[in-house]
Amino acid sequence: AHAWGYGPTDGPDKWVSNFPIADGPRQSPIDILPGGASYDSGLKPLSLKYDPSNCLEILNNGHSFQVTFADDSDSSTLKEGPISGVYRLKQFHFHWGASNDKGSEHTVAGTKYPAELHLVHWNTKYPSFGEAASKPDGLAVVGVFLKIGDANASLQKVLDAFNDIRAKGKQTSFADFDPSTLLPGCLDYWTYDGSLTTPPLLESVTWIVCKEPISVSCEQMAKFRSLLFSAEGEPECCMVDNYRPPQPLKGRHVRASFQ
């Protein structure tokens, strides 16, 4: 596998040399211009059903941390919205900045948030996540912005596991967590056709970006930044600025579920 990261030598502007699709027609993230998004009355409300017992573990993969879910049944799913069929939750992860003025991957009229949550789902018309990931309608990712405010009690349960996964390659069991507790109260969203935001940058994602952010405190953001890109025994390198900047829209349309 090609090494990639977020530094000056292996960061997003260098990915194209190993992953030429980085310059493709439907890359993510994007800057969402609310005025340029068209309201589509045909977009249904999102239907999310998550089973906390599907939650398996939390791990530091050296690019972010992710919480993984058992995806061998239809007990944690995303339906409706802009998609057809049933998509199963595979994992969720975050992207964040070194300071509170940056960190999200999507931006809204140029506004950056300090972090962004991604809930990754795969289309069950394909036999596995791995196969779905290369299909144009294979994945659906729900993106949620984090905005500085009150401490987020649901998020705190995730952050409390960080002591066990500080370094790259570490993982620990993480059970009975309901990811729906991380969703905003209002599920109005923008949607567009895009890609994974990390290599291999496959153009297989229906993006569903929630309009309403969830809260995170400054202290909680500091906890995100205590994770390490580096493995144990290596020089410590704080995990910050693990986001890809917005990519060209290239004629794509962004639709809104709300007026």
UniProtKB/Swiss-Prot annotation:
Modified residues (N-acetylalanine): A1
InterPro entries: CA_dom (IPR001148), CA_dom_sf (IPR036398), Carbonic_anhydrase_a-class (IPR023561), Carbonic_anhydrase_a-class_CS (IPR018338)
Residues that bind substrate: T197, T198
EC numbers, comma separated: 4.2.1.1
Catalysed transformations (reactions): hydrogencarbonate + H(+) = CO2 + H2O
GO CC annotation terms, alphabetical: cytoplasm
A Pfam short name: Carb_anhydrase
MF terms in GO: carbonate dehydratase activity; zinc ion binding
Keyword Membrane carried by entry: no
Active site, UniProt feature: H63
Annotated SUPFAM superfamilies: Carbonic anhydrase
UniProt cross-references to PANTHER family, sorted A to Z: CARBONIC ANHYDRASE, CARBONIC ANHYDRASE 2
Name the UniProt record assigns to this protein: Carbonic anhydrase 1
Species per Swiss-Prot/TrEMBL record: Chionodraco hamatus
